[in-house]
Amino acid sequence: MCTSRQIIGSLLVLSVLEIGLGLSSVAVGAVTFFRVRMEQKPQLGDSSPVWSGACFLICGVCGIFCAKKKSGLIMILFSACCICGLIGGILNIQFLRALNKRSSSLYSLYLASMSLACIGISGCTISTWLTCRLASYEQRRMFLEREHSLHHSHEMTEKDTENITNGGGPLALNGRV
């Protein structure tokens, strides 16, 4: 079983990868969009690599926040960003598949964008899974801390009760025995 430190380390690595993929996707998408504008009339989906890259970029930044501060709300935010990254990547692939059938002059750029989207989708999927593992680990840790705290307070209560009932010495009230 992975430790919390290993999960956080993996999450940091994947988050940095997502940031890199996001920046690369935005760059390739911008180049593709400007080449399309020079060669032909822009169509629906020409800017989809930019949008999916933005989703991957946001996902990576939230992943770094999630790894640094393991609060429940940040984990939920990160999971939501990963789901948005998944949706953005899938839509990017679908739009580019349709555009690739119409124009073969930009095939290499479309292929690069689809490859980046596939890697980004995989990263988002693994990040979501790791976040669920981290949340489960944190929940278990908090439960054990609470259980230990309750067990400790229960032991202290038993000792106090035992001292009173078993003649554990006279009780001092206001300094008097």
Swiss-Prot record:
Q: Which domain of life is it from?
A: Eukaryota
Report the InterPro entries cross-referenced here. TMEM196
Topology within the bilayer: Multi-pass membrane protein
Q: Where are the transmembrane segments?
A: 11-31, 47-67, 73-93, 106-126
Q: Where found in the cell?
A: Cytoplasm; Membrane
Instruction: Specify residue ranges for compositional bias: Basic and acidic residues.
Output: 152-162
Q: Where is this region: Disordered?
A: 152-177
GO cellular component labels:
cytoplasm; membrane
Q: Per the record's keyword annotation, is Ion transport included, yes or no?
A: no
Q: Which UniProt keywords apply?
A: Cytoplasm, Membrane, Transmembrane, Transmembrane helix
Q: Does the keyword Cytoplasm apply?
A: yes
Quick one: where is this thing mainly located?
cytoplasm
Query: What protein name does the entry list?
Result: Transmembrane protein 196
